[in-house]
């Protein structure tokens, strides 16, 4: 579904991505893990065409209408309420407006349907952005930190929703710095540090390789051993 090969991105003399290679297979959930400034959002911006690479190749086997995006900014109209925001996208994609409430329910915002986006908390805005991304059931979801502003209980519910979307046929590529979330949700993870992927693989297998199983698998310990950086 996604193929990234030897990707390079520079800003002036600063190389922010260094020879990044990563694949995401059909109906797979893959997370890009790393601290702030590691290059996660840069990769998302390259995938979505917002910026251009300075080297390497990117292939996405989906048309723009088959890709649902949840980015840090954009896509939500602050003067509209939650339901109006989704109804706008429902009309664009030729969907019945009943789909809007269905999706709001799935992200836990049904009770806030008539609340203006400008009045939402950061976490609620994040869930509204996810609702916008999934309203037309895209076959590929690209999500930038989809649970970063959520409390643990709500974050768990959103992870369960993402797993259901995958069961329904979606491929999901996301960025996160939440190791527990990645461990429970993802088929594979790629650990990104200072613009380089230092390791990638199945989460529990990585924990086994680096003796980080302990009582429960600990991806944070794996990252610390590989980079010297604690998340």
Spans of features found by a protein language model:
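Conserved ABC ATPase signature
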Residues: 116-123
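Catalytic Walker B motif of ABC-type/P-loop ATPase nucleotide-binding domains
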Residues: 141-144
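Conserved ABC ATPase "signature" region
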Residues: 87, 91, 96-112
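ABC ATPase "signature
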Residues: 200-201
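A short, surface-exposed alpha-helical micro-motif characterized by mixed small hydrophobic
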Residues: 182-184
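Helix-to-loop junction immediately C-terminal to a conserved catalytic motif
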Residues: 48
């Amino acid at each position: 579904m996604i193929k990234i090969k030897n990707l390079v991105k520079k800003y002036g003399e600063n190389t922010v991505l260094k020879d990044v290679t990563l694949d995401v297979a059909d109906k797979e959930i893959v997370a890009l893990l790393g601290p702030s400034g590691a290059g996660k959002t840069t990769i998302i911006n390259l995938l979505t065409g917002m910026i251009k690479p300075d080297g390497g190749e990117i292939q996405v086997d989906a048309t723009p209408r088959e890709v649902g995006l949840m980015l840090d900014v954009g896509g939500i109209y602050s003067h509209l309420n939650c339901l109006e925001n989704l109804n706008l996208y429902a009309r664009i994609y030729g969907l019945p407006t009943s789909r809007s409430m269905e999706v709001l329910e799935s992200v836990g915002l049904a009770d806030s349907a008539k609340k203006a986006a400008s009045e939402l908390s950061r976490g609620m805005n994040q869930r509204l952005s996810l609702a916008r991304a999934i309203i037309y059931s895209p076959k590929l979801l690209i999500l930038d930190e989809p649970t970063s502003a959520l409390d643990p209980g709500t974050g768990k519910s959103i992870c369960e929703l993402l797993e259901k979307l995958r069961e329904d046929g979606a491929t999901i590529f996301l960025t996160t710095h939440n190791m527990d979330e990645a461990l429970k949700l993802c088929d594979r993870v790629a650990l990104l540090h200072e613009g380089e992927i230092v390791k990638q693989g199945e989460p529990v297998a990585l924990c086994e390789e680096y003796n980080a199983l302990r009582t429960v698998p600990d991806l944070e310990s794996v990252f610390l051993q590989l980079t010297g950086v604690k998340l």
